[in-house]
Amino acid sequence: RGAEAALRAVAVDHRLLGGVARSAPEHHRLCVWGPDTGLPGGTRHMAETDSVQVLQHGVALGIDTFREFRRAMSLAEGQPDKIICHQVGATHQRTILNSLCLPPDRDFTTFRHLGNIGTVSLPITAAIAAERGFLEAGDMVGFLGIGSGLNCLRLGVEW
């Protein structure tokens, strides 16, 4: 759903240039949610996340995916011009930007006022960034998503 929403955020006058998706399903148990079936007749839900391991393995997957994205998109040094990342929090943002050698001023964030809103955070953040003039015509924008499972998507959009 997050990838679908990200594609819908790309307006008619913007062009999807391509992308790369990778997964690391061996880490699928790091974030688990759903009905707690251990209770007879219960409809309670449970959620468990090993946030330290999600960050560690997510960043490793993110680095590999970004490396492949840069190669597949034939990105010039210094590209993408702007980035919109999955919005989790300050620690995750700082860690992934440092790991990818991306300067923080290229990233637009919303987690400080919207919080972690899951799979819709990337398209909502892109819409707000566009509305506020952060994304400019001609920018090569990298949409960078990492989610539990672990799954990683990198899209290149000509703004």
What label would you give each PLM region?
Residues 59-66, 77, 81-159:
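Claisen-condensing/thiolase-fold acyl-transfer catalytic domains that form or cleave C-C bonds
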Residues 1-60, 64-67, 146, 159:
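Condensing-enzyme catalytic core mediating Claisen C-C bond formation in acyl metabolism
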Residues 38, 72-75:
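Short, conserved, surface-exposed binding loops centered on an aromatic residue
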